[in-house]
């Protein structure tokens, strides 16, 4: 039994819960705009990130050297978005967006808002949480980030968007 790591700072846990709850709401709105196969908004306990993924229904090329779980997770073409607390190559809380497989030209795509950038070590777009926190319209800024990544990847990869997206007037929260 782990008795050494059982303490925590309640203030930080409560702040994290408030942030992740808000992010879940925005991710759910983004999720509602898609009628193709998608994951629910879900929390990865291993990497401690909240994510939502859209699939286009096509098989992806196999990932050489990938373990079983990774092979299964990326068996079909997808565009994924998430939020994590940071660590490794990004030392601050941030949102991310990527396409698997990554279509040609994706690295050069324009992501919104202007604080978003392509992280060459992670092969994904990153938007610092601080940029969203300071935004005049945080929900709009986050939805713009997610939509801009999705549109860039889906267009470059020739997804059949008209078959996968809910008409704007029918978006459901």
Range-by-range predicted roles:
Residues 77-126:
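Low-complexity, glycine/alanine/valine/leucine- and proline-rich hydrophobic stretches
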Residues 32-36, 106, 155-162:
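Intrinsically disordered or highly flexible coil/loop and linker segments, enriched in small
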Residues 1-11, 93-96, 121-130:
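Glycine-rich, often proline-containing surface loops adjacent to acidic residues and nearby aromatics
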Residues 4-87:
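Aromatic/basic-lined ligand-recognition segments
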Residues 117-173:
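TerminUS-proximal long segments
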Residues 1, 44-46, 170-173:
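Charge-rich, acidic-biased intrinsically disordered regions
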Residues 57, 88, 104, 132-134:
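Generic "edge-of-domain/loop-turn" microfeature
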Residues 28, 102, 154:
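Residue-level marker of positions within ordered structural domains that often coincide
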């Amino acid at each position: 039994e782990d008795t050494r790591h059982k303490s925590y700072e309640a203030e930080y846990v409560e702040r994290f819960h408030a942030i992740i709850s808000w992010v879940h709401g925005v991710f759910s709105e983004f999720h509602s705009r898609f009628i193709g196969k998608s994951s629910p908004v879900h929390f990865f306990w291993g990497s401690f990130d909240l994510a939502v993924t859209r699939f286009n229904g096509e098989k992806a090329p196999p990932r050489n050297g990938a373990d079983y779980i990774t092979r299964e997770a990326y068996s079909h073409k997808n565009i994924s978005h998430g939020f994590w607390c940071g660590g490794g190559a990004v030392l601050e809380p941030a949102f991310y967006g990527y396409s698997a497989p990554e279509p040609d030209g994706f690295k050069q795509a324009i992501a919104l808002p202007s604080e978003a950038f392509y992280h060459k070590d992670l092969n994904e777009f990153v938007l610092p949480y601080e940029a969203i926190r300071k935004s005049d319209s945080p929900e709009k800024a986050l939805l713009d980030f997610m939509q801009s990544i999705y549109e860039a990847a889906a267009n470059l990869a020739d997804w059949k968007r008209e078959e996968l997206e809910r008409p704007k007037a029918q978006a459901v929260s």
